[in-house]
Each structure stands twice: as structure tokens, then as C-alpha cells.
Amino acid sequence: MRVQRVWMPDSGAESWMVFGDDHAPVAPVERWLAHLTVIERSSNTIKGYAHDLKDWFAFLQLHRLDWRRVQLEDLGGFLAWLRLPPRVRDGRVLVLASVEHHCSQASANRKLSALAGFYQFHARHGIDVGELLIGLRPGGPPGGSWRPLLHHLAKHQPQRRRTVKLPAPRRQPRVLTARQVQAILDACEHLRDRLLFAVLVDSGMRIGEALGLRHADLAIAERQVTITPRANDNRARVKGGMSRTIPVSAELLRL
């Protein structure tokens, strides 16, 4: 199986598709990914989901399972299969217990989240396996004593949660010291590179947001930068498709 970039015939929007060993699109995956493209989900998100579903259908194919008839035990087998190095996933080679897991807990949980969305989508079209990954639990009070204003209206509503989720340690973000930041700025030989890194440091915006900036997004007098979702030739994207305005320093604008 393979994942390939495609462009939607009607809108020209970039999307992704999973092809089987017969070089034909995997129909249920194609339908869901096309839906995500229509509702303007990020191309990077769709790409990640495509790879997640490729792994799932490769596992189903290897074990001769129908994607509409899977059991909870099959999901557990999929998680164990993901942790194996790809070269031994066909089961012909035994793996020692000391071998490091190939897929982290966070990556496995992301794949489970993709499967949950995939099965929820198809459950709305008459395929009744979405509850395998998404269970319902009675509504209850959140932790602590705080209650939202309309808590009394929603406390009896069932809440959705994933049936299976691996415990994953929280990763602390890595930060640069002021000395490291200055060293990087001083090492930039071109003003363009120095400006890009200074924008990231001063505003805290994401790299995709910075790479999509245009002159019209800068308000010099107000000392503000507006992040605007748009289609860029360099494929830079604003995460979540949300626009916002960020205050910046006068020193940055002088660059």
C-alpha cells in the first residue's frame, strides 16, 4: 500500500489518497479523506490520517480481516503490530523483547484518533462499528469544584471518549536560552533569514504562519502582524485556519 498526493477535480484543493497493492484507491478511506478535504481540513492533517489508515488497512490485509467486522481484540493486535519494526511485521521473524518499540505511545494514540474519526464517519452511513473505538459514558461533573454556567443543562448528557488509549508521557517543549537565540541571529548571513528567525522569536508564531506572511500583513504604526489563512505558493498554512493579530516589537519592525 502507498499514500499519494492528489488534487480534487472540482476545487483543485490538495488532498491525499491511499492506494492498495492492486493500485486502486482504498474506497472507504478515499471517501473519508475526500470528506475532510471538502470541509477544508488541513492538508497536513489529511496526509497524517492517510498514513494512519494505510497502516490499519495493511494490518487488516495481512490478517485477512474485514474492516467492517473488526473486534476489540483486533485493535489490540494492531497496536502490538505497530510497535514492531516494519521489516518484521509480516510475522516471519521473531522479535526479542529487548528491541525498542518502533511506534511511540503518542503516535499510536494519534492513529487511534484517526481510526475513531474514520469509523464515526462510516457509522453515519450504516456501518455499525464506530462504537468499537468511541464509547459513551454518562455525563458527570468535571474534576474539582468548578462548574460551568450551564452545567445543570448538560450534566446528564453522555460524553464521548475513545475506548482504547495508550498512556503517553507528557513531553515538555524545548526552549532556547537568550544566548542561544542571539547566537542564531548573529549567525544569519542574510537579512531575510535574520528577519524570519526574529519574527519567530518575537511573535511566537508557527513556522508555517511566518512563511505565509506578506507585506500587507504588517501594520507598522500599530506594531502588529496579522496572520491570515490563505493559499500560498510555498504551501505554508495557518494551523486551524484561524486568523489573528499579534503585537510585535518596534525592534522587529525596524528590520
Indicate residue ranges for each PLM-predicted region.
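N-terminal core-binding DNA-recognition domain of tyrosine recombinases/integrases
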Residues: 29-44, 54-151, 183
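N-terminal DNA-binding module of tyrosine recombinases/phage integrases
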Residues: 2-39, 61-62
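Conserved tyrosine-mediated DNA breakage-rejoining catalytic core shared by Y-recombinases
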Residues: 208, 212-254
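DNA breakage-rejoining catalytic core of tyrosine-based enzymes
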Residues: 142-182, 222, 235-250
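Major-groove DNA-contacting interfaces characterized by cationic-aromatic clusters
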Residues: 95-96, 163-167, 229-230, 250-255
